[in-house]
Amino acid sequence: VKCGACSAVCPSFRQDRRESQSPRGRIALIEAVLDGRLAVSDLYQDRLATCAGCMACEGQCASGVPVTSIILAAKEQAVQESGAGIVQSVLAGALRHEAVMRSLSWLAPVALHFSKGSVAGGGAGQGSRKIRNADYGMRNGSGQQVAARKKVIFYPGCAIRHFQQDIQQSTAAVLEHLGYHVVIPDDLKCCGRPFLSLGDRDGARNLAEQNTRVLAALDAEAVVTACASCGMTFKRDYPELLSRSGIRPAAVMDIHEFLADKLAASDLSTPLHGRITWHDPCHLGRGQGLAKTARSVVRRIPGVMLVEMDRPDQCCGFGGLMRAVHPALSRGIGRSKARDIIATGAATVLTGCPGCRMQIADSLRLEGAEVAVMHTVQVIEAALRSAECGVQSAEDREIEKVRN
């Protein structure tokens, strides 16, 4: 860490060029606290909170220092010694209460509303509005009425459940098209990722135990999520969080991982039209090693041209609750990502994380760009069900030209 090579890829350091906001700087502060040379303070906790948890530094570190884990442990120690800050306490309180989260659901359509045209037709915000009052009859499903069909449990996570139900709609539609009965249990909780970011490891452990018990009681071929952060938390953090209780973690797959094995290019019979680019969520690429897998799924979508942006795996600035705790820093990082997207000339940017989707949508809005921001499953649904989704395929466009 002391060589500083990690600073070159740290989004918060690249944005403000402050040593205390670099991986090396944060580790130095943590060492000073452990050695008794520095007391835990609001400023110390503030500097730890400038870490987005993107893990780019770990990929750059020749010594293999687990920087992200060290920072999360330091946050936990700081909260135990001095308590959480005001913003962090408010966030934790909101995350613990479903009613509060539901009351904020109007924020997603506002954040995504500006997305105008897209490769799948219509804006991302339109999907958010469509699903709002819809009942797809998937919750609390026992699967008895469709016993002959294979069952998949969908874990939505907080962002999809409360803010972007259009992703849930598309995921269910794609899985059902492939012959699966989709079950979304009502009593699933937050995955715990925000609590880890806040330094509340006990809170995260409690959620991990609740979720694992719910999933263990259901018999299904797979548990699938469309949120990169949730997927990473289940895979990387649940084994340690559950080690005391002896509960075995559920095997959870990201939707790209699942579709890479189940979805054939021949399933996507409706050619779409458009130039797209892809943003690697930190928790999907570095967190789960699925960057190539996600692209393999995207490339199966007929009729679209994938144009890679510069630094597709550069953090968008949403992670680690940075958007809430350090909004100006988060916006700066996000706008840098938006400019990379704009430079591709793509009409649509795809990603595999609802948090990234919200952040990128807002960042593109700030840059004045009309680029649609969509989850991969939304475009796949369009290629599967163009007529039902109101999507105009390339073939339909040609027919319309002839008619006119």
Predicted features, each with a name:
Residues 1, 5-29, 50, 54-77, ...:
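Iron-sulfur cluster-binding cysteine motifs and their immediate structural context
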Residues 3, 7, 45-58, 188, ...:
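Residues immediately within or flanking Cys/His clusters that coordinate Zn2+
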Residues 11-16, 39-42, 93, 344:
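A ubiquitous short alpha-helical element
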Residues 13, 33-37, 285:
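Alpha-helix C-capping/helix-to-loop hinge sites
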Residues 14, 34, 58-61, 195, ...:
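Short amphipathic alpha-helical interaction patches enriched in hydrophobic/aromatic residues
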Residues 31-53:
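Aromatic/His-enriched, Gly/Pro-containing loop or helix-boundary segments
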Residues 67-389, 400-404:
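Iron-sulfur cluster-binding electron-transfer modules in prokaryotic oxidoreductases
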